[in-house]
Amino acid sequence: MIRKRQSGSNKSVSSGNNQEVTRVRTPRKDRNEVLATVASLLGSKRVTLQCMDGVVRMGRIPGSKNKKMWVREGDVVIANPWEIQDSKADVIWKYTKPQVDWLERKGYLN
């Protein structure tokens, strides 16, 4: 819904509730990316991830994404497992609610 401000300016304000899914980023197998759900927040930019491949990993939010991506419990993210240590991963993408609905409809989420 778009409405005009009453202060006389001609800038419009949108409510943001009617988001449309135009393009959804899916995990790329060639980059070793997996879908994961945030199980718990550990603090200090660290989270516990329940990955779709059945492994529970400790996820790290890189500094470049820290301020831009606010992660909460239950969020669906893309994780990139470390090559050296498979029990750890980097969180590289967070999905919005309409994108999660699209992933469930297409069968990416179980």
Swiss-Prot record:
Cite the GO molecular-function annotations of the record. Answer: RNA binding; translation initiation factor activity
For this UniProt record, the keywords arranged alphabetically read as follows: Initiation factor, Protein biosynthesis
Compositionally biased spans, kind Low complexity: 7-18
The UniProt entry, under PROSITE patterns, shows:
IF1A, S1_IF1_TYPE
Segments of this protein annotated with the region Disordered: 1-29
Biological process terms from the Gene Ontology for this record are:
translational initiation
GO CC terms, sorted: cytoplasm
> What positions does the domain S1-like occupy?
22-96
The task this protein performs is described as:
Seems to be required for maximal rate of protein biosynthesis. Enhances ribosome dissociation into subunits and stabilizes the binding of the initiator Met-tRNA(I) to 40 S ribosomal subunits.
- Describe the family membership recorded for this protein in Swiss-Prot or TrEMBL: Belongs to the eIF-1A family.
Protein's UniProt name = Translation initiation factor 1A 3
Q: Which organism is it from?
A: Methanosarcina acetivorans (strain ATCC 35395 / DSM 2834 / JCM 12185 / C2A)
Gene label? eIF1A3
